[in-house]
Amino acid sequence: MAFRVLMVGKGLRALAARGLFDGESLVPVGPAEVDFAGALVAVQRHFPDVVLVDLSALDALPAIEHVMVERPVPVLALHPGVLSGQEAFQAMVAGALDVLERPANPGPEFWTHVSRKLVLLAQVKAVRQVQTRPPPQAAREAKPPPPYPLVAIAASLGGPKAVAQVLRMIPRAFPAPIAYCQHISDGFTEGLAHWLSNETALRVLEAEHDVLMAPGTVYIAPSGSHLLVRPEGRLELDAGPALRGFRPSCDMLLTSAGESFGPRCIGVILTGMGRDGARGLKEIRERGGRTIAQDEASSVVWGMPREAVLMGAAHEVLPLSRIGAALMQWVDVC
């Protein structure tokens, strides 16, 4: 069965005709030219399995957001090189599941890559966008350092929104640092850190080499480097080869967290394709730490969490809405 693709943006179908559609896995639907003002109407009329959006126009982001509120559908966004990583990341905030950089003169290899990505995203459930704000933080009594001085989080497709929901439940006075590995396009982690800083009460930074972690701070693995944690609480960036196709690798972060902090570590694996992170989560559990996997119903893609569950790596399998509270409970009990 071929998946139905709606293209939104001036001249996008003409560009894509160079190699996107083979008639077997993907077929175009809708008018040859769909502008952003007409995006929602086109989605409602033609029922695409996935939408391909060009980000070069100023009204692209509101159009994505409007579609995701009114009639959710998986969205892949293409951005030209003139956009910064932070600007392109805003497409993911609006609801796009992924963003790819479009070269000035894309050739067949690029469209083959886009085609494969569209086939994957067409099989992903879209989640309706709900605008939320961080809840007011209640005053908390000072407590001694917990025996869980580290929370390590791994996520892939759908991860930024999921992580934001978890972190909104955590106050600024959270007595542990949080190390976070997210599969995301190169150059977008700065935008992710900036967005999460505005969405949560926590301090959110791109991780830097040899930095001593601080409680109440989230450290994001930068694109192109593995993030590791050391027993004394320092971060290490490793530019070595990708592990099973990923750099940063969720497995490498979680494994180092388990090795370094053992029973003082809480590991969390959220929505994402594939199996990266499952082995690392099991390492945390085997060394006495506590572990959580997101449940299927609340995941955009139940791939990484499913693999962790099948391995016996998760103490608890929880809906996204309960993970933040679980982290607070486990830290507070200590």
Curated annotation (Swiss-Prot):
It is an enzyme of class 3 (hydrolase). One of its GO terms (cellular component) is cytoplasm. The keyword Cell wall biogenesis/degradation does not apply. The keyword Cytoplasm does not apply. One of its GO terms (biological process) is chemotaxis. Residues 147-334 form the CheB-type methylesterase domain. Its EC number is 3.1.1.61. One of its GO terms (molecular function) is protein-glutamate methylesterase activity. It catalyses: [protein]-L-glutamate 5-O-methyl ester + H2O = L-glutamyl-[protein] + methanol + H(+). The active site is at S156, H183, D276. Keywords: Chemotaxis, Hydrolase. InterPro entries: CheB-like, CheB_C, Sig_transdc_resp-reg_Me-estase. Probable methylesterase. Required for the normal aggregation of M.xanthus cells during fruiting body formation. It is also a component of a sensory transduction pathway that controls the frequency at which cells reverse their gliding direction. It may remove the methyl group from the gamma-glutamyl methyl ester residues in FrzCD. This is Protein-glutamate methylesterase FrzG. It comes from Myxococcus xanthus. The lineage of its organism: Bacteria, Pseudomonadati, Myxococcota, Myxococcia, Myxococcales.
